[in-house]
Amino acid sequence: MPDQRELLLAERALAVDRIQLLEREFADIAASADGTDDEHDPEGATLAFERQHTAALLDQARAQLAAVDQALRRLADGSYGTCTRCGRLINADRLAARPVATTCIPCATSRRTR
């Protein structure tokens, strides 16, 4: 599946870029808060929120990168496109929409309804 590999590599590049951007943003927030007492400074609550928000976005970007790397490993070992729960093939439309999918739609749906 060379098209999937290209798609995954493009997603990986986007995730790496996003991580780098968010790391710079987090460093900028930390630098602007340097010496600020969050508790008594009127800007402190805003800075604390920005820091938490950016940290959460950074965690999401890192999780996305890990999912893409896992998908690339599955592609290399030949298990990409096979549902990890039932062993059936994952629909091509699902993989096109969500290239890091590890489950087919029926398994993903049954997991959500439990």
Where are these regions (language model features)?
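Cysteine-rich micro-motifs
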Residues: 100-109
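Short, cysteine/histidine-rich loop/knuckle motifs that typically chelate Zn2+
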Residues: 85-86, 106
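Cys/His-enriched microdomains
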Residues: 81-84, 102
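Short alpha-helical
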Residues: 14, 90, 102-103
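Short functional micro-motifs and their immediate structural scaffolds
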Residues: 91, 109-112
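C-terminal structural segments of small proteins and small subunits
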Residues: 92-96
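Interaction interfaces in information-processing and related assembly proteins
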Residues: 1-77, 97, 114
